Amino acid sequence: MVEYSPGGGWYSQILARIPANGGSYTALVTSAKAAEGVRQMLASKGASGAVATVDPATGASTVPANSQDVVLTFRNVHNLTMAGGQSAANVFKSWYTMLKPGGTLGIVDHRLPASADTARERESGYLKVATVRQLAEQAGFKLAGSSEVNANPKDTADYPKGVWTLPPTYAAGDADRAKYAAIGESDRMTLRFVKPR
């Protein structure tokens, strides 16, 4: 199993323990500097696993082709799209390459309503489901399912400081903090794609 860009390790501390019965956990990051930070984070959480890299500029990865059953990413695709260029497309292609045929790509990210102006994806931290589907399908994936487990109908996705206005970040500081706390964390898409056999 690969987790792309594990950040502070909230999911990693759980995921790194799952493949104990003969499987493996690999954290996938975009630089050697990030790799060292992830190694330290995993150790601090009592978790273990390999750390690999992917270059968003090229899609080249240290994870072998056709070697993984699952790739997961939590709230990271918006960062790839906001980076511009081919970063998102290249990383999606790398995920496709590292997965075995029949393997699963799981994505959770902040959801922009389908009716919203697509230009808002550039800076808000929100993405349309259609944008994520297009990236995945262009890399060769097929949509296999979705879930509303991370849905939040209170989130209107139209805040002055984007998704970071909401908890836990509260980018607006104390301004309207109670209002944003009542909304809660972002509305999120939860998508499952497969690499065809």
Regions found by a protein language model. Give the residues of each.
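Conserved beta-strand signature within the Rossmann-like core of class I S-adenosyl-L-methionine
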Residues: G102-H110
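Conserved Class I S-adenosyl-L-methionine
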Residues: T118-S146
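Conserved class I S-adenosyl-L-methionine
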Residues: M1-G7
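A short acidic, Gly/Pro-enriched loop at the edge of an enzyme's catalytic core
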Residues: S61-L72
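C-terminal lobe and adjacent flexible extensions of AdoMet/dcAdoMet transferase-like proteins
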Residues: D176-R197
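S-adenosyl-L-methionine
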Residues: G37-A60
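A short glycine-rich, Lys/Arg-flanked "PGG" loop and its adjoining helix->strand segment in the class I
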Residues: R17-P19, Q86-P101
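Conserved SAM-binding loop of SAM-dependent methyltransferases across substrates and taxa
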Residues: G8-N21
